[in-house]
Amino acid sequence: MNSKLLRSLMVLHGDTNASLAAYLGITENSVSNKINERGTEFKQREISKIMRRYDLSAEQVREIFFA
């Protein structure tokens, strides 16, 4: 996971862990843990929502979540 790239997109779009968590329907702690690779990974449903929120291409999704 490329957490730096995801965090840069969050900043670019004015998101915080809290706002992204609310959008995804998960806790802020869960977002933090997933970004920092502590435990669980983002689920497919969450990745799809992030893709739509930030208007990401399939290549960008691969760079962020499958690097």
Give the ranges of each region predicted by the language model.
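DNA major-groove recognition helix of helix-turn-helix
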Residues: 35-36, 46, 65
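Short alpha-helical "recognition helix" segments of helix-turn-helix
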Residues: 19-21, 50
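Short amphipathic recognition helices of helix-turn-helix/homeodomain-type DNA-binding modules
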Residues: 60-67
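DNA major-groove recognition helix of helix-turn-helix/homeodomain DNA-binding modules
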Residues: 45-60
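A short, Lys/Arg-rich alpha-helix, primarily the initiator
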Residues: 1-15, 23
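Recognition helix of helix-turn-helix/homeodomain-like DNA-binding domains
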Residues: 26-41
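DNA-binding alpha-helical recognition surfaces that contact promoter or target DNA
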Residues: 8, 22, 33, 63
